[in-house]
């Protein structure tokens, strides 16, 4: 039995999540869809809008199983969030991880993930961190490809891909183009409703 995993917060569950879950199952041609979902706290420790059981109930309209992401993942940066989520997916023997991204270019995101793993080992990277430069700024300077690093779902997708390369190299990835309003967009785009 083949499974696709979705690393989620569903804070709250909406039509975009339903679209992502449905398309992920269709494109991955899997039998089971598993959501690895944050509990009562979402990324970086923000309290969830709805209790985890209510969000699970909503999610089960689109997925077959919801497993709670360990709390340490929810309280962490995107790289640690991704690492904990991928390790959880590996424990569940998930075959494919599907995530949304603004670019929808798995090839470009995988290439950048590989570059970033190499750059993080470089002495210049560690020196720039000591100088107080931010992680995204250093990476955009080193990669010279800051367009992919300007979009929050691309950044999170790259974190998933890095974690997969390091901890679950047998796992496959699938990315779905994020449609509609962007993560930090302050104006609602009515053309996608």
Name each model feature, range by range:
Residues 14, 59, 161:
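Divalent metal-coordination and catalytic microenvironments
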Residues 69-193:
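Active-site cores that bind ATP or allylic diphosphates and position pyrophosphate for catalysis
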Residues 57-71:
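A glycine-rich helix N-cap at a beta->alpha junction
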Residues 27-31, 63, 94:
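Short, high-confidence coil segments that cap the C-terminus of an alpha-helix
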Residues 1-55:
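N-terminal catalytic cores of NTP/NDP-binding nucleotidyl/phosphoryl-transfer enzymes
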